């Protein structure tokens, strides 16, 4: 038996994250990366001190009232906490954490990717290439919209 706190990681995370967790915790992994039903989540929580869930695991009041006293923290691998009944967890004495602002830069980068792709017709060009339909060029072909000087 380990002296380390027991941690349930509910979804498959990167190998580096799982290895780091295993260094400091007695880790229980979801190797199949399957979404737990509410009852499965409760069953898995019975023998752990901490849970590292994603937004896909719902900690509703019905689930929270059945959580064991030994569970002390839900350390979310997500920005939001809308999947957690914070009032019920607070009443139970379970600390809830999240990762605020962790996705802000990535979201902005994806917004630029989508805007440039739409302006320059990247998706349409990709489909043409894959279908073998890109067999000519002309000065007006697939020009798209120039973004220089545009305001968002």
Regions found by a protein language model. Give the residues of each.
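Conserved hydrophobic beta-strands of the Rossmann-like cofactor-binding core
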Residues: 8, 151-152
């Amino acid at each position: 038996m380990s002296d380390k706190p027991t941690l349930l990681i509910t979804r498959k995370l990167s190998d580096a994250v799982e290895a780091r967790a295993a260094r400091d915790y007695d880790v229980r992994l979801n190797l199949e990366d399957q979404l737990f039903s509410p009852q499965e989540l409760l069953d898995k929580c019975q023998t752990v001190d901490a849970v590292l869930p994603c937004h896909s695991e719902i900690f509703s009041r019905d689930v929270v009232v059945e959580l064991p006293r030994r569970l002390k923290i839900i350390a979310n691998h997500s920005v939001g906490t809308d999947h957690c009944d914070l009032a019920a967890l607070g009443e139970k004495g379970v600390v809830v954490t999240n990762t605020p602002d962790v996705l802000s830069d990535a979201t902005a980068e994806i917004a630029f990717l989508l805007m440039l792709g739409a302006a320059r017709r990247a998706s349409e060009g990709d489909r043409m290439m894959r279908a073998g339909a890109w067999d000519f060029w002309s000065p007006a072909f697939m020009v798209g919209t120039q973004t220089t000087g545009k305001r968002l």
